[in-house]
Amino acid sequence: CLVGSEMCIRDRCLFAVMLQAARVDTVLVRSAAMNKDVKVVYVLPDKAIGKQACPVVYLLHGYGGNARSWVQLKPELPQMADEKGIIFVCPDGKNSWYWDSPENPAYRYETFVTSELVKYTDGNYATIPDRKARAISGLSMGGHGALWSAIRHKDVFGAAGSMSGGVDIRPFPQNWEMNKQLGEFAANKASWDAHTVVNQLDKIVNGDLALIIDCGEADFFLEVNKDLHNRLLARKIDHDFITRPGGHTGTYWNNSIDYHVLFFDKFFKK
């Protein structure tokens, strides 16, 4: 009957929708380097749930954030995962700035993100275990962390991005607990110099990484991002650099992630 046919059609539509539902997992990943478990949120597209290998984008939160920051900031992330067939991995980086801290041996988040977490992800999910299918990005502290990680571990990541990143920490010596990780600026200038992204560029040449960098025009990190852009130009390192109206806000990053995912998706498909 007609009603029965309509019910069947609706059932098929519901079944199709169910097949395309991304899954959000929260897991504890063991860090041998820090001797503790680290909370990580995984956004898994239907393809990965079905064991079809997918590329991976690691997303790092900002100061004061946690593993759930990105799924809260961008509720559409599961839908984006399904549309692009990308796994998103969002670790809890505390307020570490994603360094292996020279002052605090309990904070070895560079090792965790670039080694332990990548190995866990590739060992437990349907990934493409290759730098050409692996990208990393983040906001604010996480933008610094993403570029820091990728530039220093270009064998692990093929692409990297930064949204409103603190890419030169030295103009902000009293902010965001960085002195807990590096020591007081006045007494440890060499360490601060060595742990800022703009001083890592000698580790890469053009073509090593696909890079996207953006910052709001009303952001307090705008000038350090412009400086990074100019340093990359001076070294003839190709990169996308975007400034748009906006400040250091969730509204800005909710928009930024769209640009970064598009950039990474194109990189993965090369």
Can you annotate each of these PLM segments?
Residues A21-K270:
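Non-catalytic cap/lid and distal C-terminal segments of serine-dependent acyl enzymes
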Residues R12-A21:
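Hydrophobic h-region of N-terminal signal peptides that target proteins for export
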Residues C1-D11:
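Single conserved hydrophobic/aromatic residue that forms the stacking wall/gate
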